[in-house]
Swiss-Prot record:
A GO cellular-component term linked to this record: cytosolic large ribosomal subunit
Lineage: Bacteria, Pseudomonadati, Pseudomonadota, Alphaproteobacteria, Rickettsiales
Annotated family: Belongs to the bacterial ribosomal protein bL19 family.
GO biological process terms on file: translation
Pfam family, one: Ribosomal_L19
The protein's name in its UniProt record: Large ribosomal subunit protein bL19
Keywords, comma-separated and alphabetical: Ribonucleoprotein, Ribosomal protein
GO function terms (MF aspect): structural constituent of ribosome
Claim: Ribosomal protein is one of the keywords in the record: yes
Organism domain of life: Bacteria
Protein transport among keywords: no
Function: This protein is located at the 30S-50S ribosomal subunit interface and may play a role in the structure and function of the aminoacyl-tRNA binding site.
Coiled coil ranges: none
């Protein structure tokens, strides 16, 4: 029974596969997704800090936090959801935790995250 479920999940992951960049908690993300109203469908952009990432195969998801009008908004996105259009990493953050839920209580300068340095591999032998 579990083999059938694993095979089904793997098939669905191949069908729903997308170009999702490598990102970690602490990174600033720009998530584009479809919003379906009763009569129309539109694309919306949610930009904020990734506060958690959950790798569970077909059920993989991540949470993004943004501050809008002084209120903290956390939104959960499934990586293999057909509603998810694209994910872009705008800035890499340097953190020491896998889950950054403590950021939900912080605002302004207290909620800042240091930028992670990225180096290019120079192999000029």
């Amino acid at each position: 029974m579990t083999n059938l479920l694993k095979k089904f999940n793997e098939q669905q992951m191949q069908v729903l596969a997308k170009e999702v960049p490598e990102f970690r908690p602490g990174d600033d993300l720009k998530v584009t997704f479809k919003v379906v109203d009763s009569t129309s469908e539109r694309i919306q952009i949610f930009e904020g800090v990734c506060i958690s990432k959950r790798n569970r195969g077909l059920h993989s998801s991540f949470a993004v936090r943004k501050v809008s009008h002084g209120e903290s908004i956390v939104s959960q996105f499934f990586i293999y959801s057909p509603a998810l259009v694209s994910v872009q990493v705008t800035r890499r953050g340097k953190v020491r935790r896998a889950k950054l839920y403590y950021l939900c209580k912080l605002f302004g300068k207290a909620a800042r995250i240091k930028e992670r340095a990225t180096y290019k591999n120079n192999k000029s032998n």
